[in-house]
Amino acid sequence: MRDAFARTIYQLAKEDPNVFIVVAYISPAASMATFQKEFPDRFINIGVAEQSMIGMCAGMAMRGLKVFAYTIATFAAYRPFEQIRDDLCYQNIPVTVVGVGGGVAYSSLGGTHHAQEDIAIMSALPNMSVMAPCDPLETEAATLACSRLRTPAYLRLGKSGEPILTANASEPFEFGKSRYLKKGNGTCILSYGPIMKMAFEVAEKMERMQKTVSIISIHTLKPLDRGGIAKALKTYSEVIVIEEHSERGGLAVQVKQIAWEEKASCRLLTFSLEDKFIHTYGSQQDIWKAHGLSRDDIFYEISTAKRRVRWLKSIS
């Protein structure tokens, strides 16, 4: 995803001399190398000074520049939170804060690098838009969308190596709108970010059981497409939410609220990171598994829930 972001921002910079990147001690090697080489005056590495990075970006944007603040997600969202709130959101300054390695992408680096609450924190800020694309193609589209906003935005990216999932999407990318990546009947999965690949793996396993599954990308977490989610809750008999975020303040909580408000009668199952600090050591997939977010764990819970419903019906 970071390479897709770098390619897109480079193209934007070729077309618009007002595009700047400010990074906090992120190596320009690989993804950012071309941008830095061709536009050295528009690539600023401020060092380990994330609060100053946000303040600087706010001032640059007030002078008419189109600024992207880029660093590892925990250091993009948590360390400079006061500056994001007061310098950007309070004054409604159009700066895009880019958090790379959202969720537990930087798995083995430990808790300081696990962004498991960032969606909740950024979504709580007035004027802030929040996007979390699921693959490189959505990353390109989300980056372009951020460049057009006249408000602050938080763009949560994965790291690298994410598969292409949206090449055959049923609907185009549109800021603030959910979209179908595939259509089926009966069951619908809502997801976002790199863990979307798990949604496809779960759907594939369900379809071996002669089930057709819809998958919807909730790439924009704020403003949330409440209408699109409400429609899914009313259309399908079973709705599943899969996310790489704490169960507190993420997509699952909001879907549950919409389901309650809409009096939806579907079976709703949610799968999130547990509400605790992560002490598991291993890869991103290892941590997913430890939190019940592997393909087999999710499929087992779905199957168990269905058996439980059938049993309750048999004794009622």
Q: Predicted regions: what is each one?
A:
Residues 1-156, 161, 172, 311-316, ...:
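Thiamine diphosphate
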